UniProtKB/Swiss-Prot annotation:
Found at the monomer-monomer interface of the photosystem II (PS II) dimer, plays a role in assembly and dimerization of PSII. PSII is a light-driven water plastoquinone oxidoreductase, using light energy to abstract electrons from H(2)O, generating a proton gradient subsequently used for ATP formation. It is found in: Plastid, Chloroplast thylakoid membrane. It is a single-pass membrane protein. One of its GO terms (biological process) is photosynthesis. This is Photosystem II reaction center protein T. InterPro entries: PSII_PsbT, PSII_PsbT_sf. The lineage of its organism: Eukaryota, Viridiplantae, Streptophyta, Embryophyta, Tracheophyta. The chain crosses the membrane at residues 3-23. Belongs to the PsbT family. PSII is composed of 1 copy each of membrane proteins PsbA, PsbB, PsbC, PsbD, PsbE, PsbF, PsbH, PsbI, PsbJ, PsbK, PsbL, PsbM, PsbT, PsbY, PsbZ, Psb30/Ycf12, at least 3 peripheral proteins of the oxygen-evolving complex and a large number of cofactors. It forms dimeric complexes. It comes from the Eukaryota. Keywords: Chloroplast, Membrane, Photosynthesis, Photosystem II, Plastid, Thylakoid, Transmembrane, Transmembrane helix.
């Protein structure tokens, strides 16, 4: 049970980091295209 909770926490943290990076990258592309 503890292992499951730890895995869920790890996946959640990884997902949040991945989402933050994915959301931060796209804005850089349109900015370059606008210029």
């Amino acid at each position: 049970m503890e292992a499951l909770v730890y895995t869920f926490l790890l996946v959640s943290t990884l997902g949040i980091i991945f989402f933050a990076i994915f959301f931060r990258e796209p804005p850089k592309v349109p900015t370059k295209k606008a210029k």
